[in-house]
Amino acid sequence: MERLDTFLEKIQERAKTYIGYPVATDYDYKELYPFLDYSLNNVGDPFIASNDMQAKEFEREVIEFFSELFKAPAENHWGYVTNGGSEGNLYGLYVAREIYPTGMVYYTESTHYSVQKNIHLLNMESIVIRSQPNGEMDYADFEVTLQMNRHRPVIVMANIGTTMTEAKDSVPIIRDCLKKYAIKSSYIHCDGALAGTYLALLGDDDFNFEHGADSIAISGHKFFGSPISNGVVLVKKSYKERIGRAIPYIGTLDTTIPGSRSGINSMILWYAIQKWGKDGMLQRAQNSLENAAFLRDKLNEI
């Protein structure tokens, strides 16, 4: 069709100078093209079979890869492939609310805009914490606010790479603050959409489950690159089991935010993981940092 041809030419031209938006562009998924002829629907829980036209086997391998990367408990982790980081954050907050219905959500002024929207959708109470100049949480302000609300369960949205400055909140410091004020009922969700994957590969991962995270969300299209936005959310399995319910007509548990989910998205992430491998991803992360430093230095020369 002429209109599609014209639009393709416009996109191809734009792609030549398209920088600054957090998506990778050096990907090739042509081997997956034949699967676009089929409606692969990963409806429901990835670890429970549903219909015959699904790609859950690939989704489960993706979940296991990220569970290992983020050092999730061996026998107590679960997750699914999302439509992106915002959905992953919504899921983390949803689980936290079900565990602590009277909990107060704490997030910084540098937090992604979707979090405030998710809090509104879930009808949760929240407090905004000041950010330091670099975008990281102001822990002194966090402590002051905690003292005023010690009677409430604490739900923290920790940023692992803010949108504008790529700042990272410290989960260990947040945990220390909770311990200092003897707060026993708490939940920390880590928004790793921008930097979570590559920081974990580089070993800068004090936000993982071993360091105190209860759930983590990442974006797939930012670091790996994808023509379709996607992501992954991980949570402790014991928490997920509090919200699952059986749905007879789909033959599986309803444990995800959406019902129908694209099987192709799981295959895209699986393919990227297989193509790059952990060593290849590490090199990719290091190259990205080197390129960013080079660009920064050149811009500073102007």
Language-model-derived ranges and their functions:
Residues 61-65, 91, 118, 268, ...:
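Amphipathic alpha-helical segments that form well-ordered structural scaffolds
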Residues 1-76:
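N-terminal entrance/gating region of PLP-dependent enzymes' catalytic architecture
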Residues 201, 208-302:
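Active-site C-terminal subdomain of aminotransferase-like
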Residues 50-54, 80, 84, 162, ...:
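Conserved aromatic-histidine-acidic binding/catalytic patches
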Residues 57, 75, 80-243, 264:
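Conserved PLP-enzyme active-site core in the AAT-like
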Residues 67-71, 147-151, 179-183, 238, ...:
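Generic secondary-structure signature for well-ordered alpha-helical cores
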Residues 63-67, 71, 94-97, 120, ...:
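Amphipathic, well-packed alpha-helical segments that form the structural scaffold of globular domains
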